[in-house]
């Protein structure tokens, strides 16, 4: 079994899509090992997206991510990183396939409902960024 990190973004939380997204996750044979809702501050969002610091969209991304609450999750399952990325769909919802989270719920390239780790290594980093050892179910 493998773990991956998932995040339901502010636009999806504000549109009351948490339950619908979790339903899709669970129907695709993921086990939710940990979950919490939080409001990121600017420092937390800048730290989480530090890899994009030099990109022109960085400040807009940070502003968006602190615009409302998020839901962070640890998902567990076979090939969790790859399978969750497939379930999310393409970053740009216009390119996402039917049946994916982003095709179903994304508004735009920025307001694309969810985030997911892009590698095993980043899954560990992102899980550790949001969850301490006491918040995880093995």
Curated annotation (Swiss-Prot):
Write out the annotated subcellular location: Cytoplasm
Report what the protein is called. Nucleoside diphosphate kinase
Residue positions binding ATP: 9, 57, 85, 91, 102, 112
The cross-references to InterPro entries, in alphabetical order and at most eight, read: NDK-like_dom (IPR034907), NDK-like_dom_sf (IPR036850), Nucleoside_diP_kinase (IPR001564)
A Gene Ontology biological process noted in the UniProt record is: UTP biosynthetic process
The gene for this chain is ndk
This entry's Gene Ontology molecular function terms read: ATP binding; metal ion binding; nucleoside diphosphate kinase activity
Q: Where on the tree of life does the source sit, at the highest rank?
A: Bacteria
> What is the recorded function of this protein according to its Swiss-Prot or TrEMBL entry?
Major role in the synthesis of nucleoside triphosphates other than ATP. The ATP gamma phosphate is transferred to the NDP beta phosphate via a ping-pong mechanism, using a phosphorylated active-site intermediate.
Q: Which organism is it from?
A: Lawsonia intracellularis (strain PHE/MN1-00)
């Amino acid at each position: 079994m493998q773990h991956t990190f998932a995040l339901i973004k502010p636009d999806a939380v504000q549109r009351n899509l948490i339950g619908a997204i979790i339903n899709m996750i669970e129907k695709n044979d993921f086990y939710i090992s940990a979950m919490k809702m939080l409001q990121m501050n600017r420092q937390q969002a800048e730290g989480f997206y530090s890899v994009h610091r030099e990109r022109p969209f960085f400040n807009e991304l940070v502003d968006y991510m602190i615009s409302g609450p998020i839901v962070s999750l640890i998902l567990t399952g076979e090939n969790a990183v790859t399978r969750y990325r497939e379930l999310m769909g393409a970053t740009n919802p216009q390119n996402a396939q039917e049946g994916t989270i982003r095709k179903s719920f994304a508004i735009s390239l920025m307001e694309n409902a969810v985030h997911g780790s892009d590698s095993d290594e980043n899954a560990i980093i992102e899980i550790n960024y949001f969850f301490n050892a006491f918040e995880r179910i093995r």
